[in-house]
Amino acid sequence: MNEKTLKILEFNKIIDKLVSLATSSLGKELAEKLVPDTDLNRVERAQKETSDAVAFIARRGTPPMGGIHDIRDSLKRVEIGAILNPGELLKTADVLRAVRNLKSYASNDRIKTDEDNIVSELIGCLESNKRIEDRIYMSILSEDEIADNASPTLANIRRQIRNAQESIKDKLNDIIRSSRYQKYIQEPIVTLRGDRYVIPVKQEYRTEIPGLIHDSSASGATIFIEPMAVVEANNHIRELKIKEQAEIEKILGELTGEIRGIVDSLKSNVSILGRLDFIFAKARLSLDYNCVCPVLNDEHKILIKKGRHPLLDKKTVVPIDFWIGEDFNTLVVTGPNTGGKTVTLKTVGLFTLMTQAGLHIPANEGTKMSIFKKVYADIGDEQSIEQSLSTFSSHMKNIVGILKDVDEDSLVLFDELGAGTDPTEGAALAMSILEYLRNKGSTTVATTHYSQLKAYAVTTKFVENACCEFNVETLRPTYRLLIGVPGKSNAFAISKRLGLFDDIIEKAKEFLTQDDIKFEDMLMSIEKNLNQSENEKMKAESYRLEAEKLKKELEEQKRKLAENRERLIQEARAEARKILLEARKEAEEIISKMRRLEQEVHNAQRQKEAEELRLKLKRKVDSIEETLELPLAPKNALVKPPENLKPGDSVLIVNLDQKGTVITPPDKDGEVVVQAGIMKINVHISNLKLVDEQKIVLNNSGIGKIGMSKAKSISTEIDVRGYNLEEAIESVDKYLDDAYLSGLTEVSIIHGKGTGVLRSGIQKFLKSDSRVKSFRLGKYGEGESGVTIVELR
């Protein structure tokens, strides 16, 4: 990609922002090297990894990227047999912890990630090693300190050192507190010189305390002496220190050996961590600028929806709509200076570079970007003082370089093409350059204020006009890009608004040719028509959004209706269960009374009374069945069609639960037109009810029957083999109801032998059932332990 183009379009500023969002030197290094790619497949993958990282952050929050160090040099040293120092080992442990934290971050999500999620794949390739990580942290406290418990030997040596040091301090304190030596001591303190314990002695008494002189004060008044009484002890400490250092070297060697065993894994981890840091930096850039992933193509088609230049103030930037590549591949943008033409060029160019670098772009969903092999830009004043080139010459030199390399896979951006020289010749050159690029098949966007180029765009195939809108009333540009409309100079209108005399303006108009006047009138007509089209488009979009909103509301109301219907059904089932329980209780009372009567005397009168009770029980059960078999009124059955419907009546559309107003009387088929919000709907009167007719009509026809269909003849056994325990108990419970009401005194429950779960669960249920008098396992010939025989009361 052309380096000059990257600079002109300020791609480097986007890279600077990206670098600042990376947390590690590894991620920053990758960000600094980022350049646009020209291969569609690679760009698609780069865009996808950015999208995947955005999805990760949206679901899981900010990833833990701390502790990612560049330990590649340390790993090289490990490979050649060197021993790592404590600082290097700590950084290695940090990397292992970073790996573990990222894997935990990725796994703490109940939402399954797409199988082809690039970020998930990378994190899955990381290899943690908590054992080595913990051992390093346990052994090393800082870059300068090894922990006592790094090894038992080190702990023992340091204990000996501390004991020896305390012994020396005690001896030296005895000397400085002794009345014999007090007048020789400069200060009653024990201090260190090198690694030897000494005491400060006055210069004039240095011979009074036998020992080794190690240092003196700056003034020479104090001599630091190691008394002979502690020389041997200091020597012992020195020996222990040597042993301590040797043990530390041994520990560092062992830890380095652990690292050597996983060096390949660590090298892979470092590479992946750097890549992840870079990818998450791209995701944060996308979120910071409210970006989207563009739809990619290699057909030179660009469609930008509400694109916002990322380097402009978010509060003031005006979004642009831009397209090229469908009906035209050359766009001529005209309009006043500072009207936004250059910003449009830079937005298109920078969006292309960002897209091909795998970065999201600040635009709306549905934005499409093409992959170009080459991107060229001639924007701004590139005059070279050193080469003594004029503005025109400087631009022309740049343009010549572009024209030499351009081809059909090139995007070319020109700002004020042909400016800086005679207008007639400049316009002619500009048209010739555009024609050359058009014949080459390049995608070209050029800004200009030459009227000749407007006419060229109108009359040339695959070339289109555009302008940056200018508000004559406020004398300010709106920065809106209008494609299909040539720009107007607005010189007369602006001059008039600024107070220029009318007679001067009218005289100026006389100098215009008739063709100029017709052309300006045509531009005014085109702009007016486009504005009307834009207004209609905005109005249509408003209607569309309102319709979508209404659709969502209707769907939500439909969902609530379904929920209410389900709730009513559940309530009805609960009521049915309540009725059944009451019936069971009453039946138990009747049967109990019947059995008492049968057991008293067997005369005809008693038998007659027993028969009456049996008939009463049967009528009760039949009554319950009839009650439970009454249908629930379906949602459409609750409506009684209104009579005498007329326009203006307020109605409720039942299946939509939406209020509306009748517009037409019923036709021959019983349909009326109803205004519901912004929609007019044909509805049958059976699906309507007047708003003031809120009565719910419940009849005995419809659907949704909830019934308790008891068999006319009840079997003496039930088979629940293959059921789970809950299903089995529910089936047994219902079966015992029927058997009990039918007057059976003994039934068999076939549960099978198996694991015994069904047998024990069912028998536990039977123990607490008031309908059961007793139960037992089957005997030989009855099914043995695979069957439970139940005696009913």
From Swiss-Prot:
It comes from the Bacteria. Keywords: ATP-binding, DNA-binding, Endonuclease, Hydrolase, Nuclease, Nucleotide-binding, RNA-binding, rRNA-binding. ATP binds at residues 335-342. It is an enzyme of class 3 (hydrolase). Residues 718-793 form the Smr domain. The keyword Zinc does not apply. Pfam families: MSSS, MutS_V, Smr. The keyword Transcription does not apply. InterPro entries: DNA_mismatch_repair_MutS_C, DNA_mismatch_repair_MutS_core, DNA_mismatch_repair_MutS_sf, MSSS, MutS, MutS2, P-loop_NTPase, Smr_dom. Its EC number is 3.1.-.-, 3.6.4.-. GO terms for biological process: mismatch repair; negative regulation of DNA recombination; rescue of stalled ribosome. One of its GO terms (molecular function) is mismatched DNA binding. Transmembrane segments: none annotated. Disulfide bonds: none annotated. Endonuclease that is involved in the suppression of homologous recombination and thus may have a key role in the control of bacterial genetic diversity. Acts as a ribosome collision sensor, splitting the ribosome into its 2 subunits. Detects stalled/collided 70S ribosomes which it binds and splits by an ATP-hydrolysis driven conformational change. Acts upstream of the ribosome quality control system (RQC), a ribosome-associated complex that mediates the extraction of incompletely synthesized nascent chains from stalled ribosomes and their subsequent degradation. Probably generates substrates for RQC. PANTHER family: OS10G0509000 PROTEIN (PTHR48466:SF2), OS10G0509000 PROTEIN-RELATED (PTHR48466). Belongs to the DNA mismatch repair MutS family. MutS2 subfamily. Homodimer. Binds to stalled ribosomes, contacting rRNA. NCBIfam families: mutS2. This is Endonuclease MutS2. It comes from Acetivibrio thermocellus (strain ATCC 27405 / DSM 1237 / JCM 9322 / NBRC 103400 / NCIMB 10682 / NRRL B-4536 / VPI 7372).
